[in-house]
Amino acid sequence: MKDLPIIALDFESKEKVNRFLDLFDESLFVKVGMELFYQEGPQLINEIKERGHDVFLDLKLHDIPNTVGKAMEGLAKLNVDLVNVHAAGGVKMMSEAIKGLRKHNEHTKIIAVTQLTSTTEDMLRHEQNIQTSIEEAVLNYAKLANATGLDGVVCSPLESRMLTEKLGASFLKVTPGIRPKGASQDDQHRITTPEEARQLGSTHIVVGRPITQSDNPVESYHKIKESWLV
């Protein structure tokens, strides 16, 4: 996978995606999430790949093991670069996801969501009834993902250093919640700058609104890219 900031294509239509991608004359690493995939379907993935871009298909699969395994068989045929599941689905579900993916595809990386970057300590305790710190909850899910054979996790950059120490540098830490200095944090809570994420051990960062909603998306992307790759 490219060592580039992953741009979250948080658009509701193919037309808006194409207008955005037309601004760039280089190969990108982009994320397609639920909103866009459910609106436009697999054909959009094929079109983005044909443009030469890497794709992270961010659907966060979470269901019974058999359903997730069968769903992953279908997604494997899209030949994206990165897919994910929810670690909360458990070891059996994650194992079936790997089996489904590998029936048709050997190169796509698969990672697990631990805790969303919008989650706070209060939400963890009072809504999820998990009576540990966010760091401990993330580490527990990351250990399960690692033991199951997944390539890494989605986590906050604030947990990246801990996960590198516990699970090694090669274990992927894909981190949303990235904001340039001075940018609005929107609905994210556990956030850092691109430079801080690199220093903390994140292997990939995901950036959406600071690029896609910028007055000059190309300039904003290059500034974030430069700060990430230093």
Curated annotation (Swiss-Prot):
Q: In which pathway does it act?
A: Pyrimidine metabolism; UMP biosynthesis via de novo pathway; UMP from orotate: step 2/2
Q: Which domain of life is it from?
A: Bacteria
Give the reactions, separated by semicolons, that this protein catalyses: orotidine 5'-phosphate + H(+) = UMP + CO2
Q: Which gene is this protein's source?
A: pyrF
Enzyme Commission number, as recorded: 4.1.1.23
What residues make up the catalytic site? 60 (proton donor)
Protein name from the UniProt record: Orotidine 5'-phosphate decarboxylase
* One GO CC term on file: cytosol
**Binding residues for substrate, per the UniProt record?**
10, 31, 58-67, 117, 179, 188, 208-209
- Subunit details for this protein? Homodimer.
Classification via InterPro entries: Aldolase_TIM, OMPdecase, OMPdecase_AS, OMPdecase_bac, OMPdeCOase_dom, RibuloseP-bd_barrel
What lineage is on file? Bacteria, Bacillati, Bacillota, Bacilli, Bacillales
Q: Which PANTHER family match?
A: OROTIDINE 5'-PHOSPHATE DECARBOXYLASE
Q: Which family does it belong to?
A: Belongs to the OMP decarboxylase family. Type 1 subfamily.
Q: Name one Pfam family in it.
A: OMPdecase
Purpose of the protein: Catalyzes the decarboxylation of orotidine 5'-monophosphate (OMP) to uridine 5'-monophosphate (UMP).
Q: Which UniProt keywords apply?
A: Decarboxylase, Lyase, Pyrimidine biosynthesis
Keyword Cytoplasm belongs to the record: no
PROSITE patterns reported for this sequence:
OMPDECASE
From the UniProt record, give one GO term of the biological process aspect: 'de novo' pyrimidine nucleobase biosynthetic process
Gene Ontology MF annotations: orotidine-5'-phosphate decarboxylase activity
